[in-house]
């Protein structure tokens, strides 16, 4: 089935208006992946399946302790994402490799630490004109094997392009 982009944008605008009634800046709220996941899970529990986020948040203040204390408790495969921005996804397979930015690295705690500290080095999404900074966090979620992927490219909360990729062939449109 085809996705009606105009209808999708209407739904997003409608949800932003609903959120504004109790949250001052809906655009910011919907810009955070983890908060968006909780919102979708709460409002569309039977319509949309999402990867389950683990209750682990990583930032540059706790990256070492998380790796030392939590890594052994995680399943063999899991995903790490930035809570904001796109394109920062790490797929960890503790039996084999770490995939990050289309590169494969041998799995080791040291390699994972290097990747995470690189991601967190640029952990502030800020306007240089403003004093406030918005700290960037990483979150962990379950690994869900998929054969195809949809990416919604948005500018100012509006979908401008939908990218569809077949992961087993590398084809996209």
Q: How does the language model describe each region?
A:
Residues 97-173:
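Phosphate-binding site of ATP-dependent enzymes
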Residues 1:
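S-adenosyl-L-methionine
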Residues 4-97, 102-127:
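A conserved helix-loop-beta module that forms one wall/lid of the active-site cleft
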